[in-house]
A protein has these predicted regions:
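Membrane-embedded catalytic scaffold of the fatty acid hydroxylase/desaturase
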Residues: 47-56, 76-230
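Helix-boundary and loop/linker segments of multi-pass membrane transporters
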Residues: 3-4, 32-38, 72-77, 113-114
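Hydrophobic transmembrane alpha-helical segments in integral membrane proteins
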Residues: 1-15
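Loop-to-helix transition at the N-terminal end of transmembrane alpha-helices
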Residues: 10, 33-50, 79
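N-terminal Rossmann-like or analogous alpha/beta NTP/dinucleotide-binding catalytic cores
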Residues: 50-73
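Membrane-interface helix-loop junction between the first two transmembrane segments
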Residues: 20-40
């Protein structure tokens, strides 16, 4: 097995230094926002995620090598083109995973940890889940091993992907050059992803390359006309670590217990917010209501403008 390092472990000192720099900068820059308790929660979740990975990651590793034994190709570890290829392929499957994590409640129950902060800063990037293995997030990578990518190769590419995503968790950077914004994931694009504003819900799933969102219709640009609200639809309003980690699992268990038998599975695999009686709001229903209201307001403005024009015409004095 090739001995490849874990890039995220080597980056820990960099994480600590840059979070500290941004935290102190927030005292002098209004657009950079930090809360001490929120930051402590994020860092605790990040630390716990490392230990959770050590304790449970063996399941994902075993599954990876099992699938790799039945690979249909052999991607050489020593070929330069193989490393370029693995970064693109890994990022594509990351997009699939990330989209699934927002559309399948079972997977969302783990991923929600990352979105539960009402702040958006470098500390938020370290707010990672503890239950990823249990949520089966590793399943989304299995096709790569079947295609012939060595598990160590995929793990290294995944680490680089996470490292890239670290710097985009900030409000300190507005926009990158236009060409960069067109191809790469950026702070602007990822702010949209973390927003709870109806126009931004379930958008911009990219890891490194924003091209996947552009290709598959999930891209939404950031607009300066609307202030971004961060967090989740029903924010935690708590800094309790265990509640932050398990609140969605608890909610899902309650729904599973009380739901009619014919709907129980749906509470696991349908999107967050789905309910069998339509009593809750999903991202689709929230966005649909927003679009309806937006359309009503547009018609109202047009009608008001038309009435104003008619009144102005009637008020014009007649010539002698």
């Amino acid at each position: 097995m090739p001995d490849l390092p874990d890039p995220t472990l080597y980056a820990i000192p960099f994480f600590i230094i840059t979070v500290a720099i941004e935290f102190f900068a927030s005292r002098y820059r209004d657009h950079i926002r930090y809360d001490v308790k929120d930051m402590a929660t994020s860092l605790t979740l990040g630390t716990g995620s490392v230990f959770a990975g050590i304790l449970t990651g063996g399941i994902a590793v075993a599954a990876a090598f099992f699938v790799y034994e039945y690979r249909i190709f052999d991607v050489p570890l020593t070929a330069w083109w193989a490393w370029i290829l693995v970064f693109f392929v890994d990022d594509f499957f990351y997009y699939i995973f990330h989209r699934g994590a927002h559309r399948i409640r079972w997977v969302w129950a783990a991923h929600v940890n990352h979105h539960s902060s009402e702040y958006y800063n470098l500390g938020t990037a370290l707010r990672q889940p503890w239950t990823s293995t249990f949520a089966l997030t590793w399943i989304f990578s299995l096709p790569m091993f079947w295609l012939g990518f060595h598990p160590a190769m995929v793990a290294f590419a995944g680490g680089i992907n996470l490292l890239y995503q670290y710097w985009i968790h900030t409000e300190a950077i507005d926009k990158m050059p236009r060409w960069f914004e067109a191809v790469m994931n950026t702070p602007s694009h990822h702010r949209v992803h973390h927003a709870t504003n109806p126009r931004y819900l379930d958008k911009n799933y990219a890891g490194i390359f924003i091209i996947w969102d552009r290709m598959f219709g999930t891209f939404e640009p950031e607009t300066s006309k609307e202030t971004i609200q961060y967090g989740i639809i029903k924010n935690l309003k708590s800094y309790n670590i265990l509640w932050a980690v398990f609140h969605e699992w608890i909610g899902m268990a309650k729904d599973l217990w009380s739901a009619p038998w014919r709907y129980k599975l749906n509470y696991l695999i349908k999107p967050p917010g789905w309910s069998h009686d339509g009593s809750r709001d999903s991202s689709e229903s929230i966005r649909a209501k927003w679009l309806e209201e937006k359309e009503r307001n547009r018609h109202s403005e047009l009608a008001s403008g038309s009435r104003a024009a008619n009144n102005d015409g009637e008020a014009e004095p007649r010539s002698a």
